[in-house]
Each structure stands twice: as C-alpha cells, then as structure tokens.
C-alpha cells in the first residue's frame, strides 16, 4: 500500500516536504539546511523512482519567481541606480569565470564541446542555457553532461551560501541590522520640537511668505498665538512671541531655528477638538498621487506631519508619491481627520486581502514575455524563458504599482505564503527529476565530468566572494544575492532567504539575474560555435 501511495504525486510531494522540514531543522554547529533540505530528500526519493510532475515544478517556479519580483520591485530600481554597476561587474565575473574554467578544463582533459556547454548549463542550473546548448550543438551529449553537473549545481550553491557566513565569521542578523541603519541614514529619523518666534525678519509674515518647508524641509504642524493653539495654513501670520511646533530631520529642525527663532524641547498640546491620527492609504485611487495634490489643509484643515513606509519615516514633501500601505500621521480637527480617513481608505483589512487577478494576470504576462525570441546580429538569439520572463514582468509591475483599477502589489503575509508554497513545489520536482538519473549518469560517464561540473560551479563563486568582499567591499547579504543571481540559482536564493529576515539578498538577486541569464546564453552560444 505504501508503495502505491508513493506513486501518487500529491502524497509523495507532501511526504518530501515534511521530511525535508524535519531534516532542515537539525543543526550541526549552528548550521542547518532549513527549507533547502527539501531538495536533498527529493534527490533521495528521485533515486528510488518517485517523480513529481514537471508541471507542478513549473507552477511552483512561477509562483516563487513572481513573488520575488513583486517584493523586490520597489527596491530593484533604487538598488540598480545606487550599486547596480558593482553588482553587474561581479555578475559578469561569475559568468565569464565559469565559461573560462569550462574551456580551460576542456583542453586539459580533452572533453568534447557539446559536453562542455552542457556542463556550463548544468553547473549554473540554467534550463534556457541547456536549450541553447542542445540547439547550438545538435548533440545529446549536452543534455547528458547537463544531467551530471546539475545536481551539484543545485547542492553546491546551497552549501556555499550556507557556509560562506560561517567561513567569514559574519552574523547575518547583525549585518542586516547594520544595513538597515545605513538605509535609514538615507531617510533621516524625524523628530519634533517647538520654537519661539524671535527673529524680527519673520514678524508679520505668513508661512507662505517665509517658505519654511522649501527652505528647511521641516513641516510646521501647530501654532500657539497668545493662548490659542491651532493648525496653521499657508496664510497663517507669525507674530513675536508665538510658538510653533515642527516635524523634520535634525538638520531641517536646526535650519528652522535659524529662520524663525529659539528652539525649545517639548510639544504644543492639542485642543479638545483636535486629534492626531495614523491613517492607512488603502484606496486604489490615491496610489501614485503626490501628497500636495490632495490639498488636505484646504479641503479638510489637516496637516500630514510624517509618512511611514516599510518601517521608515519619510518627510511629507508635496511631491512625495503615495504608495499602497503608507501610514500618514495626520493632525487636524476630528471631523477633518474623518474626511481624510475616507479619502485615503484607512482600511486595515485591505492590507491582508489578496486579489488573485493581478497575480494570475502578472504570471500570464510573464510567461508570454518569456516566449519572445530576440535576435542579434551574427545569428545569435535570446529568449528570456519562463523564469526570466516572469521575473522581469513582476519587477516592472511592482515598480509601477497600479494600472487603472489593478493594484500590482501583495501583502507581506500573502507574498510569503505563495513564495514558500512555490518554492517547495519547485524544489521537490527539481530534486526528484535530478535524482532519478544520478547514479546512472555517474556509472555511465564516470567522475570526470562531475568533477569538471563541480569546478565550474565552485570557481566562479569563490572568485565572486573574494572580489566582492575584498575589492568592492559590498555587504555579505548583497553578495549572497549577487552570487545566487549570477549563478541563476533559485534554490540558492531560497537558502539565503531562509538564513536572515531581510529582503536584501532578494533585491540583489533580482538586480543581476536577468543580466546573468542573458550573458550566460550568449557565452554558451559563443563556446558552442567558436571553441573546438
């Protein structure tokens, strides 16, 4: 009966997942495989003839890659602008060193060209690369070599990613916190203080005339004139001895003191009719609108003192484009705040709701984009493939945020659930598929091709780790994402993801993966047509 159950793909799938999680929780000297253990169990099951259908693996792959792209999209373009050049150089180093290693070992051991390009595709776990290798050589040797190199291409990257922090003696959680502090440095922490108006140059002038926000970056949220506290408008006039309360970075608050007068600590209390509330932006119509376009002071008599996004406080400048899930700190009369709440949506339930239409539509667009075939001079051609197409489309849609009524975003819990589900399906299928021929390919082709494939996997990662840390001095989290992206290794990214609560590896992976995929295909075509 148990044998019959093993031939049932759904039973085998969940058994592999359960055993994988059990194995993944075992720690040896602080090192564990986590979710990556699923692929090791799958390899064992595959060796004994258990197969998970390819369609389930592809389904899991598109879910995993799509959710990676949706999460990484907003940070992808920022990362590309700020450190993209460095990550791309490391990626090119990975691809070129893999190909040079392959060509060097080809001549050293007399390996035929079809086997070499198959080894490169397998060592870097690139299915599009295999397709190009077979097409370019018209030889079955490419697929045999791919099958030999592929298992270590998967396992080797996982183990390298797991061991690298231990070898470098770097605590990934501390590294993530350090990078978070650096990231916050780009968005200085906002503070609040009050000022006594003592500068004669602003006596009798309105806030519009002194242009405090443009000159300093601080937001004036309250005014005390004589004994009355109010929310100032652009036309509010300042008088000697008035008090104002402002919100901004330390630099902005210091500059405001130079402009208006003496700085004091504390806050001005709100009147009984006034409130300060944190409101969520959940209404689709408001997404991508600039804060200044809402005219909250004119329409509701309210002021936004800060905007919180992804754990960071942003200064509420008029040109700030609002995003779904932004939390706006609003000060005003009770009725005015109610009006702002209606305008923004302020519906916490919508943050956890999951609309499957954008997910399905995004994946459809990604699959279609992956089918495109782009031709280059000299007879070279490139197709993004399933993984590349879905990732590129997800990155673009996530950065756009909204198209008409369609919201291209996903709540954190929903993203995490779909990502984990997709990953487990993918790892189970890939493992059983690689495991079924593992022993046979060793017996048929010996250890030489396996050793060459292992070298093609390891050498680029060692070079990338050395250059990334010692030459470019990038963070280990960025390096892990770049290595897994440069090696086009989705299981490797999963291993990095499971080690730290940070999306930095995912962003780096998404930054370099499309580039790695394109250049790997081009390099394989060059080797297949030029190297003899």
UniProtKB/Swiss-Prot annotation:
One of its GO terms (molecular function) is monoatomic cation transmembrane transporter activity. The keyword S-adenosyl-L-methionine does not apply. One of its GO terms (cellular component) is plasma membrane. It is a multi-pass membrane protein. InterPro entries: AAE_transporter (IPR050144), RCK_C (IPR006037), RCK_C_sf (IPR036721), YidE_YbjL (IPR006512). The chain crosses the membrane at residues 7-26, 30-52, 59-77, 87-109, 116-134, 139-161, 356-378, 388-410, 446-468, 509-531. It comes from the Bacteria. It holds the Pfam family Asp-Al_Ex. One of its GO terms (biological process) is potassium ion transport. Keywords: Cell membrane, Membrane, Repeat, Transmembrane, Transmembrane helix, Transport. It is found in: Cell membrane. Belongs to the AAE transporter (TC 2.A.81) family. PANTHER family: K(+)_H(+) ANTIPORTER SUBUNIT KHTT, TRANSPORT PROTEIN YIDE-RELATED. This is Uncharacterized transporter BF2680. It comes from Bacteroides fragilis (strain YCH46).
């Amino acid at each position: 009966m148990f044998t019959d159950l093993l031939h049932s793909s759904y039973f085998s799938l969940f058994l592999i997942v359960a055993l994988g999680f059990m194995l993944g929780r075992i720690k040896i000297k602080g090192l564990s495989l986590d979710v990556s253990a699923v692929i090791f169990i799958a390899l064992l099951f595959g060796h004994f003839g258990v197969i998970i259908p390819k369609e389930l693996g592809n389904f899991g792959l598109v879910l995993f890659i799509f959710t990676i792209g949706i999460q990484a999209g907003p940070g992808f373009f920022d990362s590309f602008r700020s450190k993209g050049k460095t990550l791309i150089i490391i990626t090119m180093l990975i691809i070129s060193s893999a190909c040079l290693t392959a060509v060097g070992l080809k001549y050293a051991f007399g390996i035929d060209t079809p086997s070499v390009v198959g080894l490169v595709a397998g060592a870097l776990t690139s299915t599009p690369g295999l397709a190009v290798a077979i097409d370019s050589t018209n030889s079955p040797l490419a697929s045999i070599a791919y099958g030999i190199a592929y298992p270590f291409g998967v396992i080797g990257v996982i183990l390298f990613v797991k061991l690298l922090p231990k070898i470098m003696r770097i605590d990934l959680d501390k590294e993530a916190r350090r990078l978070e502090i650096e990231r916050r440095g780009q968005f200085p922490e906002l503070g609040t203080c009050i000022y006594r108006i003592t500068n004669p140059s602003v006596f009798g002038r309105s806030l519009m005339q002194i242009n405090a926000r443009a000159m300093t970056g601080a937001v004036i949220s309250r005014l005390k004139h004589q004994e009355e506290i109010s929310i100032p408008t652009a036309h509010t006039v300042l008088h000697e001895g008035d008090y104002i309360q402002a919100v901004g970075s330390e630099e902005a608050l210091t500059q405001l003191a130079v402009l208006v007068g003496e700085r004091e600590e504390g806050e001005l209390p709100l009147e009984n009719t006034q409130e300060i509330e944190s409101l969520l932006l959940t209404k689709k119509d408001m997404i991508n609108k600039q804060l200044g376009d809402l005219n909250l002071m004119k329409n509701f008599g309210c002021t936004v003192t800060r905007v919180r996004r992804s754990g960071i406080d942003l200064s509420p400048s008029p040109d700030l484009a609002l995003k779904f899930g932004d939390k706006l700190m609003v000060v005003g009369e009770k009725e005015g705040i109610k009006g702002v709440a209606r305008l923004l949506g302020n519906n916490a339930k919508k943050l956890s709701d999951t609309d499957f239409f954008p997910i399905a539509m995004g994946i459809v667009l990604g699959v279609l984009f992956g089918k495109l075939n782009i031709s280059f001079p000299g007879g070279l051609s490139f197709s993004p493939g399933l993984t590349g197409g879905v990732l590129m489309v997800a990155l673009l849609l996530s950065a756009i945020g909204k198209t008409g009524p369609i919201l291209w975003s996903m709540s954190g819990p929903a993203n995490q659930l779909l990502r984990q589900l997709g990953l487990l399906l993918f790892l189970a299928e890939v493992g059983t598929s690689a495991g079924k021929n593992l022993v046979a390919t060793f017996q048929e082709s010996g250890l030489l091709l396996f050793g060459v494939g292992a070298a093609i996997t390891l050498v680029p990662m060692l070079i990338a780790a050395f250059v990334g840390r010692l030459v470019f001095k990038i963070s280990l989290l960025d390096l892990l994402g770049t290595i897994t992206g440069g090696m086009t290794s989705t299981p490797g990214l999963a291993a990095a993801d499971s080690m730290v609560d940070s999306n930095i590896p995912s962003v780096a992976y998404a930054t370099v993966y499309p580039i790695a995929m394109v250049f790997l295909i081009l390099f394989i075509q060059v080797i297949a047509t030029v190297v003899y």
